[in-house]
Regions:
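Histidine-acidic metal/acid-base catalytic patches
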Residues: 1-2, 11-22, 155-169, 179-297
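Noncatalytic linker/hinge segments flanking ATPase motor cores
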Residues: 41-50, 70-77, 94-103, 136-145, ...
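Acidic (Asp/Glu)-rich catalytic clusters
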Residues: 16-23, 38-58, 87-94, 125-134, ...
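N-terminal pre-domain/capping segments
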Residues: 1-94, 252-297
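Active-site acidic/histidine proton-transfer and metal-coordination neighborhood
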Residues: 49, 72-170, 182, 259-267, ...
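Acidic-and-aromatic substrate-binding clefts and catalytic sites of carbohydrate-active enzymes
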Residues: 8-14, 30-42, 66-67, 105-108, ...
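Short connector loops/turns at beta-strand edges and beta->alpha or beta->beta junctions
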Residues: 59-62, 102-104, 194-195
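Hydrophobic faces of well-ordered beta-strands that scaffold small-molecule active sites
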Residues: 1-7, 29-31, 54-59, 97-99, ...
Length: 297
């Protein structure tokens, strides 16, 4: 296992992200799935400069990106977006595309359960078959009930894997989400077994590992027991304290205006209210490394 980090939590030049992460002991990234923002040759050069790799690419499911959409054109466009991420992953030598099937924050169904399931299975299968040709694995990530209504636990993902019936399909296990949804998170992790293709690092409160109540030594021990050898991708995103206790947000959040495209900004607001300050974000990354690195050496 090795220490990795997502890049979507703080929109900034990739070199800034890589320089910070590499200095703290991270050896790879899970790149935000925005092909227009990251060009293969430039990204490869930066990864080489900081002696890092791209472990995975993750779908950023905002706007109209949704495999369960009623509109077939919308579903087709979503599949196309996900295939572009497969191309990005293959071009960067990444092993995994982490796939969230539906728009994050979509909490009300628009069609029958039977139709939604059929559409999601079809979309996931098409993406997975395409990824298999590129020697990339696809890891489906279940989210908690406050971010989605459709795929929220391990059993649902395992059923989706069975129904799609493509060998390169697995699960991206995030203990922040599964601590909410699973009655026994460790048992759920064991049940996944060798289908764990990716693992995210976030506390029960979505702070950094070590700043909540999850038992990280036991979690890492369990990952070893099931044979997981991949990336452990930091994905903490604390809510902004917008009260006087947090300086009305100023202790955690960059001053506005933020130079961020509308879609990314909305995604960040939905998760944490805004753009995290550089020094605050660095402390989050450092805390995660401080907690996890001694457990995997």
């Amino acid at each position: 296992m090795h220490l990795s980090t997502h890049t979507w939590m703080r929109p900034e030049p990739l070199e800034v992200t890589l320089k910070r992460a590499s200095s703290l002991g991270y050896t790879s990234i899970e790149l935000a799935g925005e092909p227009s923002r990251y060009h293969i040759n430039e990204t490869q050069a930066l990864l080489k400069k900081y002696d890092m790799t791209c472990w995975a690419v993750v779908t950023i499911m905002y706007g109209t990106r949704d495999l369960s959409a009623v509109d077939p054109n919308q579903r087709e466009a979503t599949v196309g977006y996900m295939k572009n991420l497969v191309d990005m992953a293959a071009g960067l030598g990444a092993e995994v595309v982490t796939l969230v099937p539906c728009t994050v924050g979509k909490l009300q169904p628009k069609a029958s359960p039977q139709d939604e399931w059929k559409w999601v299975v079809q979309g996931v299968r098409e993406v997975a078959l395409y990824a298999a040709e590129k020697k990339v694995r696809v890891a489906i990530e279940p989210l908690n009930r406050f971010e989605t209504y459709l795929i929220t636990n391990v059993s649902q993902v395992l059923r989706l894997i069975d129904d799609a019936n493509v060998p390169n399909l697995g699960i991206a296990f995030d203990p922040f989400h599964m601590n909410i949804e699973e009655p026994d998170m460790i048992a759920a992790l064991r049940r996944c077994g060798d289908k764990v293709f990716d693992f995210h690092l976030g506390e029960n409160n979505r702070l950094s590992p070590g700043d909540g109540n999850l038992d990280w030594p036991f979690i890492i021990k369990t990952l070893r027991e099931i044979g997981y050898k991949g990336g452990l991708a930091f994905e903490a995103m604390p809510p902004i304290d917008r009260t006087p206790n947090g300086g009305f947000g100023s202790l955690q959040m960059e001053d506005e205006p933020w130079n961020v495209d509308e879609g990314t900004l909305q995604f960040l607001k939905d998760h944490a209210s805004g753009v995290l300050r550089d020094d605050f974000y660095t402390k989050l990354l450092a805390r995660s490394a401080e907690t996890i690195l001694p457990l995997i050496k």
